[in-house]
Amino acid sequence: MQIFTRKGSATDSEVLQALELEARSSLDTFRGGSRMGDDLALVGEGWSREVGNSEVVVFVGGVDKVVMGYLLARRGAVKSGAIATIEQVFVTKDARNFGIGDALITSSIEWAKGESLVALDGVALPGDRETKNLYKRSGLVARLITVTTDLQN
């Protein structure tokens, strides 16, 4: 069994779309998930465009050339310089605990260093222990907690 990661390409669009839909279906199980789903636009049929976007990096990963997960990070800027934020990282449920998520994070860290970014951020929902642990294993630690209240109810 060989774990791999590589940059995503237009030929990955169909599998990326399917994985994104699978990831979105689990958002409601976490506090803040439905709002995150509303705030973060679905790439959907636009994956072939997104993998060519210079402001974004998409990595795919899996086992023996079969894509089972992905990571999308978007460039941004802060006072100290250029950064990237991991907006989506997901591995299909049946392929978890093989190291695919760790490999995706490692690839994104290597990419960010190669791009001379000053930081790589990632987002995780409250209660999403798997994602939080994935980040922690890779050295990404909490630096900010966002709190909210629903003012419409």
Task: Give residue ranges: language-model regions.
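Conserved beta-strand in the GNAT
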Residues: 60, 66-75, 85, 90
